[in-house]
Amino acid sequence: MQATQPRLSFWQIWNVSFGFLGVQFGFALQNANVSRILSDLGADLHSLSLFWLVAPIMGLIVQPIVGSASDRTWNRLGRRRPFILAGAIAAVLGMILLPNAPIFVAFLAPMVMGALMVALMDASFNVCFQPFRSLVSDMVPPSQRNVGYSIQSLLINIGAVIGSILPFVLTNVIGLENTAQMGEVAPSVVWAFYIGATVLLGTVIWTVVRTKEYAPDEYNRYKGLTEEQPATEKAPKAPLGQRLSEFFTLVKDMPKTMKQLAVVQFFSWFALFIMWVYTTPAITQHIWNVDKQWFDPAYIAAAPMVPETIIMAKGAAGDWVGILFAAYSVFAAIFSIFLAKLADKFGRKTVYASSLALGGLSYVSFLLFQDLTMINVNLLITEVTVPLGAVKLLIPMVGVGIAWAAILAMPYAMLAGALPANKTGVYMGIFNFTVAAPQIVSGLTAGWILSSVFDNDAKYIIVVAGVSMLIGAVSVFFVNEADKQEIEEAQG
């Protein structure tokens, strides 16, 4: 007989997800600065998306493994917390080494070292992310699930705001240099990664210490599992062929809701990947009016010197991308506060689809905001001089933020109710395929589209992202949320 899972207080739910703030802090630093770092280390626009492929590939490999392993693990730290802590420690190592890639030039080319550290960071973030998702599903009862994932989304966006804006603050408030010659990384970016590593480790330790996972017998009672379906079942290790067969059987038999959400996820994450990779060159070209030739390493190498105005414009644009990313995270954090109530009132599908549509239209509107007029902007903590078009780009960040909040919460809230309790971890891991696969497709195609179709004019690839997200919005209406019978059949 299934026992009623106890309700959690607000602060208990907060503690379960608090580590997400630090993980997203690091993730935001990566999203806003990796293209900038790799460009400074010598990557061209076409190859940028290829370097970024390590992120979804790591997710594709790591999350299903970690999901399955955490379902079968129980030690003195619990089921999910050992993986969260280990991932955080590895991520900290990557965050310290990435901005120092030029130091290792005697052993590896800076771009190669940078790519390896991006791979380490992404693998580590994925080791943290998947168990955090499953931890919320484990600890938060169904009646509080919308609240649980909304708090998670709020914390993610708080971390993203601080992480995104940090290099800008270090430059314009503290006074660190934000420019770099080819083959170097700006000091403001280096120190931002050091601070991010510290925050990540601290918040994860808070969750590990302040959250007590249910004992196996309690978990089984709350999830309605029988002795034949233990949550911590430790079967003998099967041969590789058998494990692959079992994996593909799980994929084939995954709940219908999960398959339908995969379509929405494809078009959503295809768009997000483009934004993370190409916002920096798009803003630099479109708003700061830097010619696309200054993103060609061969041209730069052949030039007698890079004009100081180009170096300064690239640094300023890179910092402003952090402001834009922080802005959409602020709007996402605000929207996430109301997300659960809106979903309860209007339905998850309506809120999800509307949010994606706003995001898609916002991407497309990037074309409308070019204005080279230089103005002084008071940001309370400092005053900067930027093109008016840069300030106007804060408008579409509202829609991007709303879409981001929905993407972080809605599919998981819809999915959690469709998964059998004894397979939550592995299915959450498999669901990451719907995050990783579209990013891989985007990484393989976006660079070619940008160079072959748009002649390296990066603003148009942002429009492609908008069209993709609009298709995702339409796809939401074809998702059927799971019913009780389907869940029981999947649980076996």
Where does each model-flagged region fall?
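C-terminal ends and interior cores of transmembrane alpha-helices
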Residues: 85-108, 357-386
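Intracellular juxtamembrane helix-capping segments at the cytosolic ends
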Residues: 127-140, 406-420
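Intracellular loop-helix junctions on the cytosolic face of multi-pass helical membrane proteins
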Residues: 1-10, 107-116, 127-128, 132-133, ...
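Helix-to-loop junctions at the C-terminal end of transmembrane segments
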Residues: 61-77, 334-348, 450
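Cytoplasmic membrane-interface "Motif A"-like loop-to-helix N-cap segments
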Residues: 72-89, 345-356
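Helix-loop boundary and gating motifs at the non-cytosolic
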Residues: 2-58, 260-264, 268-296
